[in-house]
């Protein structure tokens, strides 16, 4: 399990961590990272981003055999590269599968968070976790209080009086509004892909 591997390799390093999808690494995500780095520098904590792969919406769409699956802004390799470019020390993903889907909030804390040397946890104000999204900030704050871990809630980051979100960026891209997408991402929208070509008749000669 990548958590056990991470803990074995980096267990001696105290962490400031956050959890989320971080699709596109937009302005709101960058604000969280900025705060993480500031606190981490002050308190001598390494920064860690935990995300799920695939995206939960993609997982549920596949389970329901939906043709139009949710479009992600960037693949996970691009996400990791941009996290590195933004000076995040560590990042790893949790495989979103039926096992993770069915985890209660208590199990998630026991099997994921408690295995990491987290001293400070930062989450978005809309963060939910565990089976049926039953875990929330108050649940994590109570866990943190009992384990001497600071749990902090990050307020909504807004632009044009609307919460910046990956969903909004996907909408702007789908509508062809790349200027808005660029403002929300704080960079030009790009994507990477693999191209497959069929051999030409000449290749068989």
What is the role of each PLM region?
Residues 43-45, 88, 149, 187:
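Short glycine/serine/threonine/alanine-rich loop segments
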Residues 1-6:
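Short acidic-hydrophobic, aromatic-tinged amphipathic segments that line or gate anion-handling sites
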């Amino acid at each position: 399990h990548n958590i056990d591997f991470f803990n074995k390799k980096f267990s001696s390093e105290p962490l400031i961590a956050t959890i989320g999808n971080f699709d596109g690494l937009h302005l709101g995500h960058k604000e969280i990272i900025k705060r993480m780095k500031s606190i981490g520098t002050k308190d001598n904590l390494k920064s860690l981003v935990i995300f799920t792969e695939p995206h939960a919406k993609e997982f549920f769409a596949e389970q329901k055999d939906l043709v139009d699956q949710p479009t992600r802004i960037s693949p996970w390799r691009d996400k990791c590269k941009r996290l590195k470019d933004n000076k995040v020390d560590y990042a790893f993903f949790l495989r979103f599968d039926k096992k993770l889907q069915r985890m209660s909030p208590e199990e998630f804390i026991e099997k994921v968070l408690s295995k990491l040397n987290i001293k400070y946890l930062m989450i978005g104000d809309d963060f939910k976790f565990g089976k049926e999204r039953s875990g929330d900030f108050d649940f994590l704050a109570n866990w943190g209080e009992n384990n001497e871990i600071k749990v902090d809630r990050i307020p909504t980051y807004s632009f044009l009086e609307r919460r910046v979100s990956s969903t909004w960026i996907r909408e702007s891209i789908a509508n062809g509004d790349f200027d808005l997408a660029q403002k929300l991402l704080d960079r030009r929208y790009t994507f990477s892909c693999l191209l497959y070509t069929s051999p030409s008749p000449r290749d068989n000669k």
